[in-house]
Amino acid sequence: MNKYKEIFGVDISKDVFDVHGSKSGHDQFKNNALGFKSFLKSLPKESLVVMEATGYYHYRLAQFLFKQGVLVSVVNPLSVKRFIQMKLAKVKTDKSDAKAICEYGKINEVPLYTALTDVQSECLQLFRLMDSCLKKRTATKNKIHGEDVLGIPSKYVYRSLKRIKKYLDKEILGIEKKLLSLVKQEQQVQLTLLTSIPGIGIKTALFLIVITDGFDKFENAKQLCSYAGITPTIRESGSSVRGRSRISKVGNRKLRNLLFLCSFTACKHNKGCREVYERIVNKGKSKKLALIAVSNKLIKQSFAIAKSGNPYDEKYVSVLPK
């Protein structure tokens, strides 16, 4: 017999979130403060709300419900995806996803969510703001390049775009400084340890610390690799030996992208990563697959160093479970 009065599966998107109750069935709410309050009113006492870790979208609802005394579980989307595949579900909608998450919560012993600290919450907001500024800066750079290509750019337009880029450069730098200041308040040691790894830059180290709560949210490196979605998938067909390597679309996209960018530097300056890269390429595998493996290696190194408390040492052999 389930220990909760009712289990609710929640599938969250940008504007709405779909809910499936184990007894009450499907419902949908706006993904805003009013929608949160309406959902809260509909919840029976002693209920459990299960949702996927979906980048930034799930944080607000999880935080809100936790602070209202509701039991919440945030689960790995890769685990839910595999659960759906095992059920051989043919129809995929937000409504069906909410139902699948509900069923996953009923069958599995899911971990209970612990609210973020004020520092963690502010850091995530800052990362979201930085992402927005970076996209705007890239768009501005493209416009400047476009004006150059025209050959006779308008001086007013050109200067205006330059001012916008300069402003965004300043904002991004300010956000990075604020993030660094906040993380140093609670995780100075972890930050120093992670940045000792060749290939791991300050931005990636900051993000790793924030989303893992100083590596306390994951029991092993394998769980963190799954969360990032960097376990390579190779498809093989017929007599073909070499399948196409792909990074899973499931997982934390920002972390995955940061690690993939880090892998290029790590291949050159990180002995362990370079050996992994060369071994895979020498077997005739694609360079992309090798870079995915390097990203995976970086997570394992980060996890081992964070847990051991010892800085990077290229001669060190991890004894932590993989």
Language-model segments: residues:
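Phosphate- and other anionic-substrate recognition elements at nucleic-acid/protein interfaces
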Residues: 1-155, 268
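Short helix-capping/linker segments at secondary-structure and domain boundaries
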Residues: 108-112, 213-217, 265-272, 299-314
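Low-complexity, acidic/Ser/Thr- and charged residue-rich accessory regions of DNA metabolism proteins
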Residues: 239-240, 277-322
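Helix-hairpin-helix/helix-loop-helix acidic hairpins
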Residues: 148-203, 212, 270
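Phosphate-backbone recognition surface of nucleic-acid-processing proteins
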Residues: 29, 38, 193, 208-283, ...
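Short, solvent-exposed helix-loop connector elements
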Residues: 112-125, 153, 243-246, 275-292
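Generic structural signal for well-ordered, non-transmembrane alpha-helical segments
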Residues: 131-134, 138, 162, 166-173, ...
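A residue-level signal for conserved active-site and pocket-lining positions in enzyme catalytic cores
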Residues: 101, 133, 259, 284, ...
